[in-house]
Amino acid sequence: SSGHTAGMGARFKVLPVERQGPLTYEAVGSSLSDQLPHGFRHVHVRELVSSEPSDLDRLGDALMSWQMHARCLKVQASGGVELGSTVSLRPSALPGVAADCMVVAVVDEPERTGFAYGTLARHPECGEEAFILERSAVGVHLSITAFSRPHTRIARLSGPVGRAVQTHFTRRYVDAMRKISAG
């Protein structure tokens, strides 16, 4: 099995190396670690999305069925979130841009749930992004951790605009999860 255990009841699985061929970067699974790879732009936000700790299961179900992403982007997925599943994300404001990703890690623990996806060839960036919901005494937090760098010529030329787009979508994901939480 490709699973890692981090204690009683912890379940954390990373895509086996033999299935990582289509990805456009190395360091698969690093967005879930404390060591993000050098040579990439790093993003990390952690925001309270619900003041009800009991919301973890409901919000986790929404996250693992692409509902958060669907509030921000056009989503074409091969199914729900599971190791090796693929998704094509299309910003409505950028016709012709497809951000294709593969789920490379899944977290299914009593107090944490989420996943990480990595970029495929048609993604303008290369890297990985993790979306983790975590229950605490005050509610449920959403952590988004990413490392990326330009992959296509257009992405390389976009410079600060590309970084602004990533920041924009990070904020939108947090806002979307708060709206899902509010019902």
Regions found by a protein language model. Give the residues of each.
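Intrinsically disordered, low-complexity proline-rich regions
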Residues: 1-4, 55, 175, 179-180
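Hydrophobic ligand-binding cavity/cleft-lining segments
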Residues: 3-94
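A conserved amphipathic terminal alpha-helix motif
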Residues: 11-19, 149-183
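Hydrophobic side chains in beta-strands
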Residues: 47-49, 89, 105, 133-135, ...
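Short, intrinsically disordered, mixed-charge
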Residues: 60-68, 122, 138, 175, ...
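General beta-strand recognition
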Residues: 88, 114-116, 141-143
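Hydrophobic-ligand binding "helix-grip"
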Residues: 93-137
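Beta-strand/loop substructures that line and gate deep hydrophobic ligand-binding cavities in soluble
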Residues: 119-164
